[in-house]
Amino acid sequence: ELVRVGHDSLIGEIIRLEGDSATIQVYEETAGLTVNDPVLRTKKPLSCELGPGILGNIFDGIQRPLKTIAIKSRDVYIPRGVSVPALDKDQLWEFQPNKLGVGDNITNGDLYATVFENTLMKHHIALPPGAMGKISYIAPAGQYSLQDTVLELEFQGIKKEFTMLHTWPVRTPRPVASKLAADTPLLTGQRVLDALFPSVLGGTCAIPGAFGCGKTVISQALSKYSNSDTVVYVGCGERGNEMAEVLMDFPQLTMTLPDGREESVMKRTTLVANTSNMPVAAREASIYTGITIAEYFRDMGYNVSMMADSTSRWAEALREISGRLAEMPADSGYPAYLASRLASFYERAGKVQCLGSPDRTGSVTIVGAVSPPGGDFSDPVTSATLSIVQVFWGLDKKLAQRKHFPSVNWLISYSKYSTALEGYYEKFDPGFIDMRTKAREVLQREDDLNEIVQLVGKDALGESDKITLETAKLLREDYLAQNAFTPYDKYCPFYKSVWMMRNIIHFNQLANQAVERAANADGHKITYAVVKSRMGDLFYRLVSQKFEDPAEGEDVLVAKFQKLYDDLTAGFRNLEDEAR
């Protein structure tokens, strides 16, 4: 239960009741509280206000709007005991009721109106869970604030009024009709993730990595370029300047819509900032606040992705609270219920059939960054997370030091959604699954060969192994590595990823075939050195595939890639003819 503590009315939450004494966790600095200070009960649990005005806003861990507080207090810090409503109650919103009239029956989850939130997102107003009845009044189209009654229901003789706003306790998952199997990929615009380790809309992913490996850059790239409708970005216990960077970057970033309009990314983003210099207790609440907001948009039928950066800090907050309660510590001092808390958070992700009519599906994708101390993946938080999530994008310190970004290690990462997405890939491009398998084999083979090369040198290898090493280098440096700060490579559409991979694998197959055929024939031998010297021009074109700018349009790019594919085939045919 939420309470107000002391004369400053600080926000607190009761976390344990024993006999007639209550343990209260206060979400603010508690200096100056004395014995016999009053405690006011609010008689409701820690809740989130859900309604128009969430998008483009920035909240702290217990949903206090930081912008409004800054304007009111004119201070860089949040004053103690400040009480500001989460959403602006006076702002007017354009309300448009759906085709419902007085006398119609309506139940929880039914969408009864649309509100114009911004040029990018339509905000659907649904009946809150647990409500039902016959409409006795519905407001006509017009402008209303969040305090105005827009709907009145009658059920068993009792009338109940509804505004566009409702509250929901953050620790309770919002109800759904049913959970569905996810079958659409979450396209991130990062080649290594889309092609080798795909996630789905409604999936769970973990990004563990030591400091400086680029976790934050990957989660920001997901917020900027992924194919989800809205993004909730929770900065939980990370540095304050990272949230400041997001606040500076996002309003300037634009995304191009299918109809060619440019819109600011901020219009589809909500930020929950609980940086490392804010109270630890609110850090634990911030993740729940974020997921509740995400579920609210999911219930409208949107695909939402939620970034939690980072869940390790959240686990540390749990450890601290558990220590104050004098509970029995488990591994590394974390509480024994760490794994179940993590699981209860991650299982709120998924693709669902929403309650109510019209029929709609929505999804919540959770991407959790984990920062294990010293990059040690056997840390309790990391191992508990890995037993829950389905996609693991492991970041490697050595790759980051080589300036290979995104530094996802392709030998330890995995995705358990590959089979679920096979249907989608078959439709998109029937040959893609085989190409991906081949690319993985090449990268794995390179890892095996590296030890031999270090012992005896590259020249002692067979011709096909030399070609494998060259293909792996192409894949590594020109396919998996991606520069997030260039216009042509910050976002890579899926068709470009597929075509780039196709041409590299095609080169590998043709080179191997040429070497094998010439070895059995009587003419000149074709060696790796011959291929490299004669194919210099085509090789250069393979390397520079990534410089093709998606802004030119899909047809232009596909034509270029197709021409390279045909030129490769012709080039090797000529080489073989000459060798005869």
Curated annotation (Swiss-Prot):
GO terms for cellular component: plant-type vacuole; proton-transporting V-type ATPase, V1 domain. InterPro entries: ATP-synt_VA_C, ATP-synth_a_Xtn, ATPase_a/bsu_AS, ATPase_F1/V1/A1_a/bsu_N, ATPase_F1/V1/A1_a/bsu_N_sf, ATPase_F1/V1/A1_a/bsu_nucl-bd, ATPase_F1/V1_b/a_C, ATPase_V1-cplx_asu. ATP binds at G209, A210, F211, G212, C213, G214, K215, T216. One of its GO terms (molecular function) is proton-transporting ATPase activity, rotational mechanism. CDD domains: ATP-synt_V_A-type_alpha_C, V_A-ATPase_A. SUPFAM superfamilies: C-terminal domain of alpha and beta subunits of F1 ATP synthase (SSF47917), N-terminal domain of alpha and beta subunits of F1 ATP synthase (SSF50615), P-loop containing nucleoside triphosphate hydrolases (SSF52540). GO terms for biological process: ATP metabolic process. Keywords: ATP-binding, Hydrogen ion transport, Ion transport, Nucleotide-binding, Translocase, Transport. It comes from the Eukaryota. It holds the Pfam family ATP-synt_ab_N. It catalyses: ATP + H2O + 4 H(+)(in) = ADP + phosphate + 5 H(+)(out). HAMAP family: ATP_synth_A_arch. Catalytic subunit of the peripheral V1 complex of vacuolar ATPase. V-ATPase vacuolar ATPase is responsible for acidifying a variety of intracellular compartments in eukaryotic cells. NCBIfam families: PRK04192.1, V-ATPase_V1_A. V-ATPase is a heteromultimeric enzyme composed of a peripheral catalytic V1 complex (main components: subunits A, B, C, D, E, and F) attached to an integral membrane V0 proton pore complex (main component: the proteolipid protein). Belongs to the ATPase alpha/beta chains family. PANTHER family: V-TYPE PROTON ATPASE CATALYTIC SUBUNIT A. This is V-type proton ATPase catalytic subunit A.
